[in-house]
């Protein structure tokens, strides 16, 4: 695989956002990260992202998330053909295939791209177009076929009545023979109503013989049943629909793997979360990042867990857990905030309206309600009761209670020895 070019230069004006459209998230990941992940599935020699609108934001994201990716700049948005030409500029002579895809098509998978390339090679096509059949093709370019071959692509606004009846649509995702792509792009004209250089014109050139490569055929199609893999995101409504569909698939997968989810429509699980058998999730649960939940644990209702570990048989109710470890059999909530660096050992209890931060709470220790415990070591068996503000060590069998004034004991005052 010679190269993958990801087009990510568009304005995204319909998002009405100061943030690049490509950085809006689906299932907790920027859309561009999904696109790059799919492209990596092809193991290309070159992976190029064409940037333009809000390029500084996109380049900053790539520097952190995908520093090995090459960027090319489309300073003026003159169409998809021009964007691909910008992507090719910095590449040496290419041999093999070039895949063109988009940064705002987050559900496209690496497996689909791999199969598409295989079909392209098997049929020795000049160009292979990723297509899908949809119920309502309004607004999409239509695939015109002559038998199995693609003889053209017509945009909806230019289609006649018969062509508009065609339900097979162009996704805009292609595999090109590298030589044919370079030649076709060099021949593009912007003599059209929009004054732009269209990548679809390269497809037309390959179909009518304007562009030829010895030993290669013309234009073929690879049609997929999963229409979602061809859908882009242009506004917040489409973004919400995409998030809902990705989440539906994730949630369905976990239920089939042995997780009880009381209300799948109000439970949100990001793709890197790992759940054991017999976990129960109640409504209003959000599981984010690299969270893991052990067998028999119960989470919810109304819980957010981010990059944390909830171990076997633990229970978390109406609370938030972030960058923390909740041990086996621990009970948390309701209305508690387990902040970064908190470790709750086996059978500990953190009850209502408790906040912990950077704290180790030992086995069977209890903070039943209304307390703050930060930067502390609460050893096994200790009890911290209502109104406590603890920021130092508390050792069993101590009980800390009723701290209501500035005259609290020095053992609880972190400033006392300073």
Swiss-Prot record:
Its EC number is 2.7.7.23, 2.3.1.157. It catalyses: alpha-D-glucosamine 1-phosphate + acetyl-CoA = N-acetyl-alpha-D-glucosamine 1-phosphate + CoA + H(+); N-acetyl-alpha-D-glucosamine 1-phosphate + UTP + H(+) = UDP-N-acetyl-alpha-D-glucosamine + diphosphate. Acetyl-CoA binds at residue 386. The active site is at 369 (proton acceptor). One of its GO terms (cellular component) is cytoplasm. Pfam families: NTP_transf_3. Keywords: Acyltransferase, Cell shape, Cell wall biogenesis/degradation, Cytoplasm, Magnesium, Metal-binding, Multifunctional enzyme, Nucleotidyltransferase, Peptidoglycan synthesis, Repeat, Transferase. UDP-N-acetyl-alpha-D-glucosamine binds at residues 7-10, 21, 74, 79-80, 102-104, 141, 155, 170, 234, 339, 357, 372. It is an enzyme of class 2 (transferase). It is found in: Cytoplasm. Residues 237-257 are annotated as: Linker. Residues 258-418 are annotated as: N-acetyltransferase. Mg(2+) binds at residues 104, 234. Its cofactor is Mg(2+). Catalyzes the last two sequential reactions in the de novo biosynthetic pathway for UDP-N-acetylglucosamine (UDP-GlcNAc). The C-terminal domain catalyzes the transfer of acetyl group from acetyl coenzyme A to glucosamine-1-phosphate (GlcN-1-P) to produce N-acetylglucosamine-1-phosphate (GlcNAc-1-P), which is converted into UDP-GlcNAc by the transfer of uridine 5-monophosphate (from uridine 5-triphosphate), a reaction catalyzed by the N-terminal domain. Homotrimer. This is Bifunctional protein GlmU. It comes from Cutibacterium acnes (strain DSM 16379 / KPA171202) (Propionibacterium acnes). The gene is glmU.
